[in-house]
């Protein structure tokens, strides 16, 4: 009887014990963008959905996040579909093929925005010659795309009068506001809070992508597509503006436990409204949208969830 009571007590103690702690790092985005607040919302819902999960959120950027997860510096990250595909293929700016990063979910479109001071008289990418530019640090998705756009238009950073590389959108806005830069490039949602802040201080305009540049980009990487920033998105924007687009998605280390990623994926699908409250573009996203194949291998946990709900 004593042995039986001891076994029962041990079983009850085990059942009551808290889940084993699981510490993970989640790389998000630069200050002033949408990834930091969205990361905070995901952190809350994931920690609630997975007992024992503790998430440390750190700033990041699309390409840096993919490399961080691949190199074991983080287990979760936001990324951009176009440049994640570059990593899987081992194309520049990645030094080697990315092999330890798996797809969790597509979330919403990103808009590559070329924002110019109205006084700079920049109507096309070709007009960037001789102008001063601020973009993100080397290796950031928007910075890489800035370089590609310049190249496709017969230009380079050397063709500009000055180039600033700033990690925080807020710092870039300050440079533009003070007149130390004439053009600001960034990849984020539309409207972007950083651009709204800038537009409240200076008259600005969006530079449209031309068909030749768009066609060349899409031929090199199918992850790019043309999006439209509708008239009225920003102050004094009277016309629709075509821009280069790609998707924001969540990636995870392929060796992150299957059950953990399954619960995280389910939590996202069950809380679209909570995410859309932070990033309006997520509104109406369905599991089939989250499960769209972008050329990045699915994590087994995410794949399990999508198959269960008929999205794969």
Residue spans of the language-model regions?
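Bacterial N-terminal signal peptides
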Residues: 9-15
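Extracytoplasmic
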Residues: 33, 50-52, 61-64, 71, ...
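Pocket-lining segment of extracytoplasmic ligand-binding domains
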Residues: 81-83, 90-93, 120, 156-251, ...
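Pocket-flanking alpha-helical
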Residues: 38-44, 56-98, 114, 170-176, ...
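Segments of small-molecule ligand-sensing domains
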Residues: 239-312
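Bilobed "Venus flytrap"/periplasmic-binding protein-like clamshell domains
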Residues: 24-48, 53-56, 110-178, 273, ...
């Amino acid at each position: 009887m004593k042995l039986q009571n001891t076994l029962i007590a041990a079983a009850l103690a085990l059942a009551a014990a808290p889940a084993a702690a699981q510490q993970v790092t989640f790389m998000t985005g630069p200050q002033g963008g949408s990834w930091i607040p969205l990361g905070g919302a995901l952190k809350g819902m994931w920690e609630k959905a997975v007992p024992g999960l503790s998430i440390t959120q750190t700033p990041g950027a699309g390409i840096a996040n993919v490399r961080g997860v691949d190199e074991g510096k983080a287990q979760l990250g936001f990324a951009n579909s176009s440049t994640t595909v570059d990593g899987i293929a081992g194309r520049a700016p990645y030094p080697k093929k990315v092999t330890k990063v798996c797809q969790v979910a597509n979330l919403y479109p990103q808009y590559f925005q070329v924002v110019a001071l109205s006084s700079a008289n920049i109507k096309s990418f070709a007009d960037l010659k001789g102008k001063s530019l601020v973009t993100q640090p080397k290796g950031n998705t928007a910075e890489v795309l800035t370089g590609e756009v310049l190249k496709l238009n017969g230009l380079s950073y050397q063709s500009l009068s000055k180039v600033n590389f700033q990690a925080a959108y807020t710092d870039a806005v300050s440079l533009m506001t003070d007149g130390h830069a004439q053009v600001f490039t960034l990849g984020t949602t539309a409207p972007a809070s950083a651009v709204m802040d800038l537009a409240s201080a200076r008259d600005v305009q969006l530079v449209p992508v031309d068909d030749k540049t768009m066609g060349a980009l899409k031929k090199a990487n199918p992850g790019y597509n043309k999006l439209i920033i509708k008239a009225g998105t920003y102050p004094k924007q009277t016309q629709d503006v075509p821009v280069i687009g790609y998707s924001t998605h969540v990636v995870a280390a392929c060796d992150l436990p299957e059950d953990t990623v399954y619960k995280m994926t389910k939590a996202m699908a069950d809380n679209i409204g909570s995410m859309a409250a932070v990033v309006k573009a997520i509104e109406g996203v369905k599991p089939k949208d989250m499960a769209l194949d972008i050329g990045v291998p699915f994590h087994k946990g995410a794949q399990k969830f999508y198959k269960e709900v008929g999205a794969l």
